[in-house]
């Protein structure tokens, strides 16, 4: 998780039993502790919802693609690849869905893309702490690494001829989702082994990228449930 740089504790908090135990744990972990006026914590938090403590944390420890491949092992695996998704809320929701279905990890661009922030942490319901997330300088090159590890690369596109019900989602799949406005970029699209889309009957143009990713992740899980979950 996030490395803790410093703990800010409300003055007088050491007399609170729960906080006292927490202070002991922080001391064991060799975390620096500062006692500050409660008003300072009020100013740092939302509506004073701090329970007498706030943590100053360092940068999120992103994983490497190699870490995701190690987690994927040799059997069926899903890696979600985001081609410059920019909204923190969408990113957090995608990570939550990917973690719920047991994906091996999420790969994102290191520039012009949403990453792990306080907002995306909340939207993910903490899932960012349980799933490797790799930042890479080149999405297309990361897909080459996944292909070399036996992954079949599928891109979500409204221009796909067939729906996800017919897509080759069995086994090792890298699911590529494009940005909210532009979709998958040309260079990344060229790396895709197949394109897929969600079937729909209504009048609304489409789902947003987070909703679409969730649906496709669960379709992958359904296809591989027999091997992954012991279902017939």
Each model region followed by its residue ranges:
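N-terminal positively charged helical leader segments and presequences
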Residues: 1-70, 232
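Short beta->alpha connector loops at strand-helix junctions that form conserved
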Residues: 37, 83, 109-110, 131, ...
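Hydrophobic, well-structured mid-protein blocks that either form specific transmembrane helices
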Residues: 76-125
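Amphipathic alpha-helical repeat scaffolds
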Residues: 86-94, 138, 207-211
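Structured adenosyl-cofactor binding patch, chiefly the S-adenosyl-L-methionine
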Residues: 100, 122-127, 186-232
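Histidine/lysine/aspartate-rich catalytic loop segments that bind and position anionic ligands
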Residues: 104-162
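Active-site/ligand-binding-proximal alpha/beta "capping" segment
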Residues: 154-208
């Amino acid at each position: 998780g996030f490395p803790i740089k410093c703990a800010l504790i409300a003055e007088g908090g050491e007399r609170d039993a729960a906080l006292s135990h927490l202070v002991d744990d922080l001391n064991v972990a060799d975390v620096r502790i500062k006692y500050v006026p409660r008003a300072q914590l009020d100013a740092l938090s939302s509506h004073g919802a701090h329970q007498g403590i706030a943590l100053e944390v360092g940068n999120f420890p992103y994983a490497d693609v190699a870490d995701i491949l190690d987690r994927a092992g040799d059997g069926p695996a899903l890696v979600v690849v985001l081609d410059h998704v920019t909204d923190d809320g969408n990113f957090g929701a995608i990570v939550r869905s990917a973690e719920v279905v047991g994906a091996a990890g999420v790969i994102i661009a290191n520039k012009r893309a949403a990453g792990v922030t306080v907002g995306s942490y909340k939207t993910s319901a903490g899932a960012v702490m349980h799933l490797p997330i790799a930042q890479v300088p080149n999405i297309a090159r990361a897909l080459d690494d996944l292909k070399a590890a036996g992954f079949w690369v599928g891109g979500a596109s409204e221009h796909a001829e067939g729906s996800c019900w017919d897509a080759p989602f069995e086994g090792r799949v890298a699911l590529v989702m494009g940005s909210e406005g532009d979709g998958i970029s040309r260079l990344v699209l060229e790396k895709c082994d197949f394109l897929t889309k969600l079937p729909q009957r209504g009048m609304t143009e489409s789902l947003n990228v987070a909703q679409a990713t969730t649906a496709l992740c669960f379709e992958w899980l359904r296809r591989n449930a027999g091997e992954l979950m012991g279902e017939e």
